[in-house]
Amino acid sequence: MNPNQKIICISATGMTLSVVSLLVGIANLGLNIGLHYKVGDTPNVNIPNVNGTNSTTTIINNNTQNNFTNITNIIQSKGGERTFLNLTKPLCEVNSWHILSKDNAIRIGEDAHILVTREPYLSCDPQGCRMFALSQGTTLRGRHANGTIHDRSPFRALISWEMGQAPSPYNTRVECIGWSSTSCHDGMSRMSICMSGPNNNASAVVWYGGRPITEIPSWAGNILRTQESECVCHKGVCPVVMTDGPANNRAATKIIYFKEGKIQKIEELAGNAQHIEECSCYGAGGVIKCICRDNWKGANRPVITIDPEMMTHTSKYLCSKVLTDTSRPNDPTNGNCDAPITGGSPDPGVKGFAFLDGENSWLGRTISKDSRSGYEMLKVPNAETDIQSGPISNQVIVNNQNWSGYSGAFIDYWANKECFNPCFYVELIRGRPKESSVLWTSNSIVALCGSKKRLGSWSWHDGAEIIYFE
């Protein structure tokens, strides 16, 4: 090849490479423009909710493989804003209960860093449901687990974690510090309340939106305490039941109405209920009902009915002859709507719940009438109003060969249904005092929700072998 031919060949090659480079550049530019303007075709992105007027959220996606940065501006309109929860829907019809979640915390804790907890519950928000409990500030295998049978210490805190997981130092967040708690979401943000301090001068701190808003001092100097399960909000108003005073005599109970963590109204307990502790509350049809524990006298549970719009309440006892506290006597021939039914030993009571909805009413109780073992759900039509109402069906949740504990109500109020589906949890206590070969007291959780279908029973017990911890 002569010199001229070489020059022509090199020039042609150079021109070809230039054209190819130009085409690649044009394609790259087109790709960038296409990705920029086709926001509607991108995958769903979790965009923070903004409670103000229209705002701009900027998302920067770095794609190192293609060596470009794509900056996308997404305009959020008022249509995407949150609103306060409205409790106008009725309860769903329930014919049985389906499993929702079981964390197996004790079983997993035999070989993992699982926190010692008690007084657990579940609570939902617009994004989903989380598990809550009062941590003891130590793990099952930690040396500080010795002595965690005690309810009140400076080391306890209300923690929450993703539903279905076991609580560990790595997946939990602290909601507030204390040894008694309640928490609920009003549709805009979460309110959490924790009690802490010495028995004779405890106080409550009310958190809203992740910040402390209100403090409440003790009013009777005897273990200021609250629900140990979720509160419920309606149009921004969140009533909470608190008690201060003796556990075995008349105490001072108040219903405190909060909005955005600030007190709107305080009511002294009114009605026939003589002692109130550890209420399990739910809302439907614009009304909030709290089924509580009479630790002084009653084996029948007190019921507080709250009108959150008027900020008023009444109280009475569950009328049914089916007694649901533990310990309790045998079910009598007739119930009592206006006074406690006494009897039962040795335990004065346990936290429990019910869903009271006419023919669609369900009561939960331990299978044993003397100890916190086993758990069953009983369908008892008109249990709230009929002194002769009895069960027409039942479902075993935990068999009587296994320990249960506290139980309580919750509802996913943001589920896409035409009614509010009742749900409940059962605390599965392990360790002391019943199993004294270990130094700790802790629990796992099982949660179930209502089904219109008629499903079978099974025992959802804790399942940990205590011998593995010895």
From Swiss-Prot:
Inhibited by the neuraminidase inhibitors zanamivir (Relenza) and oseltamivir (Tamiflu). These drugs interfere with the release of progeny virus from infected cells and are effective against all influenza strains. Resistance to neuraminidase inhibitors is quite rare. InterPro entries: Glyco_hydro_34, Sialidase_sf. Substrate binds at residues 118, 152, 277-278, 293, 372. Residues 28-470 are virion surface. Its cofactor is Ca(2+). Binds 1 Ca(2+) ion per subunit. It is a single-pass type II membrane protein. Disulfide bonds join 92-419, 124-129, 176-194, 184-231, 233-238, 279-292, 281-290, 319-337, 423-449. Its EC number is 3.2.1.18. GO terms for molecular function: exo-alpha-sialidase activity; metal ion binding. It comes from the Viruses. N-glycosylated. Residues 11-33 are annotated as: Involved in apical transport and lipid raft association. Belongs to the glycosyl hydrolase 34 family. HAMAP family: INFV_NRAM (MF_04071). Intact N-terminus is essential for virion morphogenesis. Possesses two apical sorting signals, one in the ectodomain, which is likely to be a glycan, and the other in the transmembrane domain. The transmembrane domain also plays a role in lipid raft association. The influenza A genome consist of 8 RNA segments. Genetic variation of hemagglutinin and/or neuraminidase genes results in the emergence of new influenza strains. The mechanism of variation can be the result of point mutations or the result of genetic reassortment between segments of two different strains. Catalyzes the removal of terminal sialic acid residues from viral and cellular glycoconjugates. Cleaves off the terminal sialic acids on the glycosylated HA during virus budding to facilitate virus release. Additionally helps virus spread through the circulation by further removing sialic acids from the cell surface. These cleavages prevent self-aggregation and ensure the efficient spread of the progeny virus from cell to cell. Otherwise, infection would be limited to one round of replication. This is Neuraminidase. The gene is NA.
